[in-house]
Amino acid sequence: MIEDVEDEILRLKNIIKRWNREYYVDSSPSVGDLTYDKALLRLQDLESKYPEYKTLDSPTFRFGSDLLNDFEEVKHSFPILSLDKTYDIKGLSLWIEKMVLESAISGLHTGISVEPKIDGCSIVLHYKDGILEKALTRGDGRVGNDVTENVKTIRNVPLRIDEKIELVLRGEIYITKENFLKINRTLKNPYVNARNLASGILRRISSKEVANFPLDIFVYDILYSSLKLNTSHDAFDKLKQFGFKVNPFCEFFGGKNLEAGIIAHVKKIEALRDSFEYEIDGVVLKIDSFILRKILGSTSHHPKWSIAYKFESCTGMSKVVDIVVQVGRSGKITPVAHVEKVLVAGASITNASLHNQDYIDFVGLNVGDIVVISRRGDVIPAVDLVIEKLAVGSFKIPSNCPSCKMTLIKEGAHLFCVNRHCSCRIIEQVKYFCSKKCMNIVGLSEKTIEFLFEKKFISSEVELYTFNCDRLINLKGFNLKRINNLKRSIEDSKSRPFRKLLLGMGIKDLGENTILVLINNNLNSFDTISTLCKNKEAALAKLLKIKGIGERIALNIIEAFNDKTILDKFNFFKELGLKMEEDNTNDAVYDSFLFGKKFCITGSFKGYSRDVLIEKLTKKGAVFSRSVTKCLDFLLVGEKFGLKVQKANNLGIKTFSLFDIKDFVDLDD
């Protein structure tokens, strides 16, 4: 038993030392923060229980170090400490309660600041007589590397401030997500994440080289000032006055509802995490009063007056065990990696998208490789990077469809199966037809549809309406109640608006916005569209005159409404009594204000989901966009809005509340 403990301590010491080297020196960590912290905590626990095995070279004795021989080493004026950490809300609440108690005992009754924890590289800025004198990396907390000339190339670092004072500041240098992706694509050996890239750039020998890269900085703390400052709130305002870039999401909390306010703000930042233009890996809480900070003091590792609440990692490492090729309803071929189960952003991941052959070649991926998996927000998990190449070469997508064996055709970066009778394409099309956004046939899940195809009960969406559901009665999982619900759901789908049926047909480039454009230009029925498309030249001329319809979309519409298979389906649905015309005098009418307006939504709205509001506006002819661009006409803003508001303001885009649009949209229907 004792020998096992000694072996585990030795193993933990060795691996943590290796991880320290990878993180601080090589800027290429092989594990995430959570894995590292768990190992370090385990080592600390064992050493406290078995102190006879704690040696002077243990990583628990010292800070990690990013010191490099290429730069001059300079001793810090103050210890540059790390932060205490917690990974759960309960731990955060306990710390807040402790700080509230300490505040009351001291009689200072101070507040607490909350700000995003930027996932970048730490920097210490020294100003003398208002002039930037030196910039040091954190190093080992006692000594850092002098990277002054490189830091001077960062545009948001003032080289001189208005007052001739002394300042020692702490900040975080980072690179935006967008710039990280752009730069990483050009590198022979790409970086795992934006933090490592920023660190790698900062440590280039030539400041001229560094100037070519778009590094940025947030300054978040004053370690020393010749000014008299009592709180971090005062310091924050002073930093802004001097022209330093500070995080706009920093908030200060105090009073009776301090804890509730902090927890709500933390959850808001976590929810908005993916909308930030830079990477964050948590939030940092700090006592506001500098006097109380001094009273509370620090350990050798971290200040007692601050804590970091770490978010779940958006990335994880896994091994690719297989690569399969999927066929979509349009025939688009998508390679998917099957990976060993890994927890990423709170979800258990076993599959990850590989996009296309070009992406596979760029990453250099094959079965057996160790990869970084990312999952952000609702985005499908994807393979970001190969970190350990264990297989030779890159996986090659077969030249034939995995389902029907027809030769694949390349269009742009993607491969397509052009066989419209391909069983995989047909199954995916039926799934789309039954989905909530189209005909919304409740009870027909993807697995149920696959089962119906497998048993040869149906072979297209048309046969959903001719199939006798009673044939399912003796099959596993189908009882009388489920069968009756399925019958009712199929029958209910017959009353869906024409625009839902048109969307469900899966015509290329004919999405919700384009359908509404057609409807509100008097192309609001099957008969009007099909009649127009009989004369292809006249149809093309008319469609191109409609705002929002380009040549590609127009040609796809014309082709679809001259396709016998599609026309036969429409005629079948017509005979069955489905709605073949949209009511152009009711909710699909273009309002004089909303006509053709492109909009986006941010925040939450009391009493309304985003989907409901989007549908109400699009019914009136507005066009929904998922992102804020210069082409946007307005941004609809609710409570707890995100960074889209800031971006809209920067672009001069109008922002509206629900009150602003109530005259144009009936919010009560």
Swiss-Prot record:
An example Gene Ontology biological process: DNA replication
Binding site for NAD(+): 33-37, 82-83, 115, 138, 172, 286, 310
GO molecular function annotations of the record: DNA binding; DNA ligase (NAD+) activity; metal ion binding
Needed cofactors: Mg(2+); Mn(2+)
InterPro entries: BRCT_dom, BRCT_dom_sf, DNA_ligase, DNAligase_adenylation, DNAligase_N, Hlx-hairpin-Hlx_DNA-bd_motif, NA-bd_OB-fold, NAD_DNA_ligase_OB
Domain of life of the organism encoding this protein: Bacteria
Record-annotated active site: 117
Top enzyme category: ligase
Pfam families from the UniProt entry: BRCT (PF00533), DNA_ligase_aden (PF01653), DNA_ligase_OB (PF03120), HHH_5 (PF14520)
Keyword annotations from UniProtKB, A to Z: DNA damage, DNA repair, DNA replication, Ligase, Magnesium, Manganese, Metal-binding, NAD, Zinc
Binding site for Zn(2+): 401, 404, 417, 422
Ranges in coiled-coil conformation: none
Catalyzed reaction equations: NAD(+) + (deoxyribonucleotide)n-3'-hydroxyl + 5'-phospho-(deoxyribonucleotide)m = (deoxyribonucleotide)n+m + AMP + beta-nicotinamide D-nucleotide
UniProt-listed Enzyme Commission number(s): 6.5.1.2
Function (record text): DNA ligase that catalyzes the formation of phosphodiester linkages between 5'-phosphoryl and 3'-hydroxyl groups in double-stranded DNA using NAD as a coenzyme and as the energy source for the reaction. It is essential for DNA replication and repair of damaged DNA.
Family, similarity comment: Belongs to the NAD-dependent DNA ligase family. LigA subfamily.
Protein name per UniProt: DNA ligase
Gene: ligA
